[in-house]
Curated annotation (Swiss-Prot):
One of its GO terms (cellular component) is plasma membrane. NCBIfam families: PRK04164.1-4, PRK04164.1-5. The keyword Membrane applies. It comes from the Bacteria. Belongs to the UPF0316 family. The keyword Metal-binding does not apply. It is a multi-pass membrane protein. Signal peptide: none annotated. Keywords: Cell membrane, Membrane, Transmembrane, Transmembrane helix. This is UPF0316 protein BC_3353. It is found in: Cell membrane. The chain crosses the membrane at residues 6-26, 32-52, 58-78.
């Protein structure tokens, strides 16, 4: 019984670590992923080793499987809270909606406006880049000002140039100045 509990706890720890390592790889953060992978591998070997010691012990196998499933739930929760990386939203509007563009820019989001031809009239598309940790804030602004907007989104693996890159460099310089002033 104690072994089954240990296996369950190890799986609850192992699977979220596996989730984080996978996310880091997808986000092109391979060094961090390798470091996390060391811990992941150690936990995996210990947990599976206990199960393989006695394959007739069904409680250990059940603990492994249930722990894995519970670990997936926990890993998904942690991933949503960490919100690593950036996301792009494409927002389609019937009119230019300068109020929305101004509010998004004022809030620090990178926004590019495109004019295009719809089936019946001119349409406008906003390309908005944001940190995933600010996605909720972004959606609240859009829904408040343009509740009928059509939106689609995708995660960004990497980017170069543009407003966000300049803003990040500026924040990094300000942080260094603050550290040296202290």
């Amino acid at each position: 019984m104690l072994q089954a509990l240990l296996i369950f706890v190890l799986q609850i720890i192992y699977v979220p670590i596996l989730t984080i390592r996978t996310i880091l790889l997808v986000k092109n953060q391979t060094r961090s992923a390798a470091g996390v992978g060391l811990l992941e591998g150690a936990i995996y070997i210990v947990s599976l080793g206990i199960v393989f010691q006695d394959l007739s012990n069904w409680m250990n196998i059940v603990a492994y499987v249930i722990g894995f499933s519970a670990g997936l739930l926990l890993g998904g929760y942690i991933e949503n809270k960490l919100a690593i990386g950036y996301i792009t939203y494409q927002v389609s509007l019937l009119d230019r909606c300068n109020e929305l563009v101004d509010e998004l820019r004022h809030s620090g989001f990178g926004v590019t406006v495109f004019e295009g031809e719809g089936i019946n009239s001119i349409r406008y598309r906003l390309d908005i880049v944001a940190k995933r940790s600010r996605e909720k804030e972004l959606l609240e602004i859009i829904n408040e000002i343009a509740p009928k907007a059509f939106m689609s989104s995708y995660e960004i693996r990497s980017f170069k140039g543009g407003y966000l890159t300049k803003a990040m460099k500026k924040r990094a310089l300000m942080k260094k100045k603050d550290e040296h002033a202290s």
